[in-house]
Amino acid sequence: MDNKNSVIKFENVSFSYNSKKQVLKNVSYEIYEKEYVCIVGHNGSGKSTMSKLLTGILKPLAGTIYLFGYAISRDNIKFLRDNVGIIFQNPDNQFIGITAEDDIAFGLENRKIPRGEIKRIIDSVADKVGIKDILKFEPHKLSGGQKQRVAIASVLAINPSIILFDESTSMLDPKGKKDIKSFMLQLRNQGKTVISITHDMEEVVNCDRVLVMDHGNLIKQGRPDEIFKDKQFLRDINLDVPFSLDLAMQLNELDEKINSTLRYNELIDNICSRVDQKD
């Protein structure tokens, strides 16, 4: 990442609630332009607090958060919120409008975008996330996955450079989870910086880099394959190994030519290749 531009930088950031024990302890890291980063950790690790700091909901007790090289303060909090969009865990917490269309329009109207331009933007983002047929629907008529698509469309409408998913798949059924994970990859491929705070290790497989939190400390970071190769490390901090890798590792114990891999398609190809060789 040496040639990448830093978009977010945490420099020795600490935070505590009501002067109690610190929930973030001297955390430092950088996230780069067009990168897809997952932040993982067990409950109480500090990852949710980090999302509130990233969006300006909370202010660090100590240290500095930089956005595109600018230190974030009360004076430029609008700059932060214009550039960082967030998709929450519970899509119901994000709905403001009477219909899906109204909800997408809300942020645009606040920015005084002309009505004709609002209609064009809504049609564009609705098409991107596949919700053109539900724009007139009321929230209670939508599934969890549809609500999250509307939430994504609402964020895309204001066109932030960075999109933060805060446990955004945890309340969805398998199809809804698959759809949202696919959108994350699409957004990264379209040039957005994507940050996902998650406990879903199957999602982490597809990201560029993982930040591992434990008891308020950033204890490890690296590519998914670097993080997941140490199963004992993950068990020690109460995190799971993705099923595909766990299965591959077990098969590797039976046949050392079956490589440990994070991806199902690679594992299947590997197994088929070994079967063909033995035939």
Swiss-Prot record:
Topology relative to the membrane, per the entry?
A: Peripheral membrane protein
The entry's function note states: ATP-binding (A) component of a common energy-coupling factor (ECF) ABC-transporter complex. Unlike classic ABC transporters this ECF transporter provides the energy necessary to transport a number of different substrates.
Q: Quote the EC number.
A: 7.-.-.-
Where is the protein situated, by its record's location annotation?
Answer: Cell membrane
Domain ABC transporter positions: 8-240
Specify the superkingdom.
Bacteria
Q: Which UniProt keywords apply?
A: ATP-binding, Cell membrane, Membrane, Nucleotide-binding, Translocase, Transport
- Family, per the entry? Belongs to the ABC transporter superfamily. Energy-coupling factor EcfA family.
Q: What is this protein called?
A: Energy-coupling factor transporter ATP-binding protein EcfA1
Keyword Cytoplasm found: no
Residue ranges that the Swiss-Prot or TrEMBL entry lists as coiled coil: none
The annotated subunit structure for this chain is: Forms a stable energy-coupling factor (ECF) transporter complex composed of 2 membrane-embedded substrate-binding proteins (S component), 2 ATP-binding proteins (A component) and 2 transmembrane proteins (T component).
To which species is this protein native?
Mycoplasmoides gallisepticum (strain R(low / passage 15 / clone 2)) (Mycoplasma gallisepticum)
Which positions are annotated as binding ATP?
41-48
Key word Transport present in the record? yes
Q: What SMART domains does this protein's entry cite?
A: AAA
